[in-house]
Structures are given as C-alpha cells and as structure tokens.
C-alpha cells in the first residue's frame, strides 16, 4: 500500500514539473516574441531615419537642359532661364510662393529669396512656346517693378496647379536689375560668373554655376550651357 502511494506521489510530482516546464517555455516564447518585435521596430525606425536623411541630402530638383540668358540693349544678361524637373524618386514638389527660396550670387551682388511664385497660365495662356512672350508677360505682371530683381516658375504639361509632378517640366526664370539703387548693376557682362541656388520645402538645394561668354550681342539669347 505504501509503495503504491509513493508511486502515485511521484506521478503527481512529475506532472507538476511538466506544467512548470511548459510555463517556462511559454514565457520564454513570449519574451522572445517581444524581443524580436522590438528588433523589427528598431530596424524599421532606423531605415526610416536613414531614408529621411538621404532625402534631405538630395535635391528635389535637377537641371534638365540648357541654361539660357537674354541680353538687354546694353549687351548685358538681364534674364536667365533654368529648365528643371523632379529628381529620380521624387513624387512631386510645390513651386508656389512661400515654399521655394531662390538666391543668386553675382560678382558684385548677392540676391536672396527672389522667388515670386508660379506664372499664371490661366491669364496668359497655357504652355506658351515663345520665351520672349513669357518674358514680356512677366514684365506686365510686375508692372511698375520692371527694374527689380525677381524670379518666377512656369510649369509645362501641367494640370493647372502649382505642383511639379513627374510628367511635368518647369522653367525657373530670373530677372536681374540693370540699374538698382546704389548704382551697382546686377546684370551680367562678358565672363561674369553666376551661381544660383534653388531650395524647396524638402531636400538639399539645387546649385547651378554658369559663366557668361565673351562678345555678347544686344537683345540676344545666349546659350550658357
């Protein structure tokens, strides 16, 4: 009888040990799950931080063609036109006034934040072909300010808004004052170098450097490369 009781007792102890072991296994599995999830979460956050840093280190815009200058009757470049498009991997960028900063660095002047927004195609016609017409219209838009430094954007193949998208192309047009207060010209003469910086809401600034050639003729379009 005593032997039978001892045998039953051993059986109960074995079951209890098994239950405790199972409990340990379940707890260990739960802890492992938590640790693995934390690892995945940390990895995801690290990836997002790296992607965000990469996005900020790259410009949202890139140059997309030839930079063109337009001289006035004094043989000086008064207008500069930069063709741009979205950089690879970018979905869109808003070009409206207040979201862009454009600065221009000249031999005798540094002009900060000249940007005035997007050219109104509703008023002046969609995707105008003749650049001179665009320049004339810009002069009309800023009537009374023809002698001021300014910059505007115009979007082609657009859907009527101020957002530049992947299927669209924009031109950033700068006007330089030939006779500003103080008498220091902002226009470019032969062999002057100009640097332009364009900064959107996200990403690094797009920087473009060009030099005016020698022997520029009056009222002519100049290929700046």
Where are these regions (language model features)?
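N-terminal leader/signal peptides at the extreme start of proteins
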Residues: 1-10
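N-terminal single-pass transmembrane signal-anchor helix
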Residues: 9-39
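N-terminal export/assembly leader peptides and their processing motifs that target proteins to secretory
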Residues: 41-225
């Amino acid at each position: 009888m005593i032997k039978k009781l001892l045998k039953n007792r051993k059986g109960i102890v074995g079951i209890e040990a098994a239950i405790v072991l199972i409990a340990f296994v379940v707890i260990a599995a739960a802890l492992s799950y938590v640790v693995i999830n934390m690892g995945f979460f940390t990895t995801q956050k690290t990836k997002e931080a790296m992607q965000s840093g990469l996005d900020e280190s790259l410009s949202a815009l890139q140059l997309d063609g030839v930079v063109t200058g337009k001289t006035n009757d004094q043989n000086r470049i008064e207008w500069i036109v930069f063709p741009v498009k979205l950089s690879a991997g970018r979905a869109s960028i808003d070009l409206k006034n207040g979201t862009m900063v454009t600065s221009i660095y000249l031999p005798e002047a540094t002009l900060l934040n000249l940007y005035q927004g997007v050219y109104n195609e509703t008023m002046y016609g969609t995707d105008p072909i003749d650049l001179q017409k665009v320049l004339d219209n810009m002069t009309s838009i800023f009537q009374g300010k023809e002698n001021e430094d300014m910059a505007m954007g115009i979007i082609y193949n657009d859907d009527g808004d101020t957002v530049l998208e992947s299927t669209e192309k924009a031109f950033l047009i700068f006007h330089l004052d030939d006779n500003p207060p103080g008498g220091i010209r902002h226009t470019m003469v032969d062999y002057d170098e100009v640097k332009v910086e364009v900064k959107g809401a996200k990403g690094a600034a797009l920087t473009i450097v060009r030099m005016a050639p020698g022997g520029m003729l009056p009222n002519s379009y100049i290929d700046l490369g």
